[in-house]
């Protein structure tokens, strides 16, 4: 009879209704790193590091770049004859110059403060070229004879288009005294130069006067130049050299020019009609007839990601450059799908695995939820409220990171002349240091956010578990794997009340108490039965062993193998 009662109790336990709390799992192989772990597989992740570009030069926010092709900035501004296509240029978003353009200073020489001029251009979007001293106004000097084979055009000697190389006329070079008043509302970029002859013979041949000077003055400039006559190696067939200068003439200011030889006078100036964010970018790429918000020398980036690793020099609304190769942000949960387990031959049916043992691939409509089983069947149901709150929280966090990083950011290369190499090296070291720090900060940010996200999901599952536990109290048993086993019958309506937080504890408490006491009694009685059987088995085994030893002794005495003496 006792065995029958025990069997019925076990059968009733097997058929007990259950509800489990768990989380979503899928076939994702996405992995993220956290502060504590590496290569954590998650259900969902978002890559926040852009690694691709289109390999083209594009318009920036609809404004075309000024691509100088084979011309340098100096060749463009002075008017190298091979750069005639850039005589008048429209508004530009940025300037593109090759690393070693063929059409630079056709007549050999230097451009004074060239790097500073390029820096100035990085804040300008449009020039308007205007004539300030007409070439025809030099009646006492030869204004058309100043040409060179070093600057050919259509097979003939020519010269820079925007300046005039003044030569003596009728064996005389009268002293020049000219001034120009800037009546425009905009600043003017004005260029001029000086010729350094190869020897004294060339000096008098071109300028008549053996000793000459050039004087240039504005409200902020006071310059006096003298030619440096010296024998030099030929470059582009020329032993002479030219040195060019520039200044910014403010509105209502005047520039005063005075010279008695070797003067390369300004004819055209550039009116700065629009200032703004620009850049001079070194690139060999061609124009791609495309539009972008972010341009690099390697190509355009069209991405909403907060970081990129394409090139440290950029122009436009660009992600932050980092040296990392991988930055992946966790948006989902740890992905640990439930493993199938073999059913044991005896014992209770294993509960559906909850958040301790693994996730559920069967729950596809939410991140957290329930699995129930009763006489009416079984099934999964997502907890929509906690899932939606979690989705909103993670989405807001990702968007916040992207918005913070996707700001107007320009990082263009700085150029230094030969006398500033130590400064250039120091600048590179500082920039490399900044990039290292920024890369470290970005990687640390991702690791910390991933740790917080996964902890956030774990906390949400625990909160859902506690919500059920506080409702059921002693009406159900905690199985230790995210599941509860009811001490009472719980149909679908009862299950739904647990899920939505309206479970009526008093309604089921009496039935649960009776079943709980019955199960406890069965356990105690079965334990006593097992103890009696154990004692009986021990005594019986000992008695059987004693009988076997006595029988063996009598047999050995009878055949003489053992001597028996009775005293």
From Swiss-Prot:
Keyword Transmembrane helix (UniProt): yes
Signal peptide location: 1-16
Gene Ontology MF annotations: host cell surface receptor binding
S-palmitoyl cysteine: lipidated positions: 557, 564, 567
Residues with attached carbohydrate: 26-27, 39, 181, 302, 500
Site positions per UniProt: Cleavage: 346-347
Membrane topology recorded in Swiss-Prot or TrEMBL: Single-pass type I membrane protein
Chain coiled-coil ranges: none
Disulfide cysteine pairs (residue numbers): 20-483, 58-290, 71-83, 106-151, 294-318, 490-494
Family of this protein: Belongs to the influenza viruses hemagglutinin family.
Role according to the record: Binds to sialic acid-containing receptors on the cell surface, bringing about the attachment of the virus particle to the cell. This attachment induces virion internalization either through clathrin-dependent endocytosis or through clathrin- and caveolin-independent pathway. Plays a major role in the determination of host range restriction and virulence. Class I viral fusion protein. Responsible for penetration of the virus into the cell cytoplasm by mediating the fusion of the membrane of the endocytosed virus particle with the endosomal membrane.
Protein name: Hemagglutinin
Gene encoding the protein: HA
